[in-house]
Amino acid sequence: MLVMAGLGLYDELDVTLKTVEFAKKVDKIYAEFYTAILTGTTIEKIEKTLQKEITVLNREKVEYETNKLIEEAKEKDIMFLTAGDPMVATTHVDIAVEARKKGIEVIILNAPSIYSAIGITGLQLYKFGKTTSIVFPEPNYFPETPYDVIKDNLSLGYHTLCLLDIQTDKQKFMTANEGLSVLLEIEEKRKEKIIDENTKVLVVARAGSIKPGLFYGKIKDLIKHDFGTPLHCVIILGKLHFMETDALKYLFENI
C-alpha cells in the first residue's frame, strides 16, 4: 500500500489527524521537500508529531528512484509525505499513477495547500486563471512564461497566482521583491505594457501560518518592502468585484 499524504503549509500543527493515524500503521515513511517546504517547523518536530522516523529523499531520489519506492510498496505499507497537498506536483501524481498501474493500493490524504490558503486574500477563487511560477534567472535561462500567463489571464479579467522559485538544496527561496523584479525585467524586454511599476499587486507571505503577511500596493513601493521570512507569493490582479475591493481595503496592509 502507498499512502500519499500532505503536511500542509507552515508547521507540524498543519498535519491532519488522519495522517497521524495512518503514520502509526505504515511500515516506513518517506518525504520530499524540494517542491515545497514547511518553513515554520523541522523534520524532527514532524517526526515527533507522527511518532515515527522519516527518510527524506532529495530531488534525484524522487525523480529517478520512484520505481524502487513503488516496488517497496508492493510488499510493505509505505507513506510518502510532501509539503502542501500531495497531489499538486506533477511528480507526485506520476508516483500515484505508476503505483496504481502495478496494482498497488493508493490512498491519498489531502492537506492545506497554497490553492486553499489563498482564500485568506478575500479574492474570489473562481476568478483565478492559470497559475504560473517565477524562477531565478540563470545564464542563458530567463523564461518569460510568467509574463505570457499574466497577459492571457488579464485578457479574461482573471487574477494570476505567481509561485516563487524554491531551491531547498541551496536554502534559497525567491522573495516577492525578486519575483517582481523579474516581471519588470521581462516587461522591459517585451514592452507590451502588461505590467509596470505602477501596477497594483498583492504579496502574500507565510500563507498557512497564524500571522501571514498580506500586502497590497504598487510594484514600485512593494519592491522596496521587507516582507519577512519566506515563503512568499505574488498575485497579479484581474478585474475586481466590489467585495474583493473591500477585502483589499480591510484585510491587507496597504503599502
Swiss-Prot record:
For the ligand (S-adenosyl-L-methionine), the binding residues are L9, D85, V88, S113, I114, L164, A207, H232
Keyword Magnesium assigned: no
The pathway this protein participates in, as annotated, is: Protein modification; peptidyl-diphthamide biosynthesis
Q: What class of enzyme is it?
A: transferase
Catalysed reaction per UniProt? 2-[(3S)-amino-3-carboxypropyl]-L-histidyl-[translation elongation factor 2] + 3 S-adenosyl-L-methionine = diphthine-[translation elongation factor 2] + 3 S-adenosyl-L-homocysteine + 3 H(+)
Q: Name one GO biological process term.
A: protein histidyl modification to diphthamide
Instruction: List, in alphabetical order, the Gene Ontology terms for molecular function in this entry.
Output: diphthine synthase activity
What EC numbers are recorded for this enzyme?
2.1.1.98
Q: Which InterPro entries match?
A: 4pyrrol_Mease, 4pyrrol_Methylase_sf, 4pyrrole_Mease_sub1, 4pyrrole_Mease_sub2, Dphthn_synthase
Q: Name one Pfam family in it.
A: TP_methylase
What are the alphabetically sorted keywords of the record? Methyltransferase, S-adenosyl-L-methionine, Transferase
Q: Tell me the SUPFAM superfamilies matching this sequence.
A: Tetrapyrrole methylase
The answer to whether keyword DNA-binding applies is no
The family annotation for this protein states: Belongs to the diphthine synthase family.
Q: Which PANTHER family match?
A: DIPHTHINE METHYL ESTER SYNTHASE, DIPHTHINE SYNTHASE
Tell me, in a sentence or two, what this protein's role is: S-adenosyl-L-methionine-dependent methyltransferase that catalyzes the trimethylation of the amino group of the modified target histidine residue in translation elongation factor 2 (EF-2), to form an intermediate called diphthine. The three successive methylation reactions represent the second step of diphthamide biosynthesis.
- Quaternary context: Homodimer.
Task: Fetch the NCBIfam families from UniProt.
Answer: dph5
What is the designated name of this protein? Diphthine synthase
Species the sequence originates in: Methanococcus vannielii (strain ATCC 35089 / DSM 1224 / JCM 13029 / OCM 148 / SB)
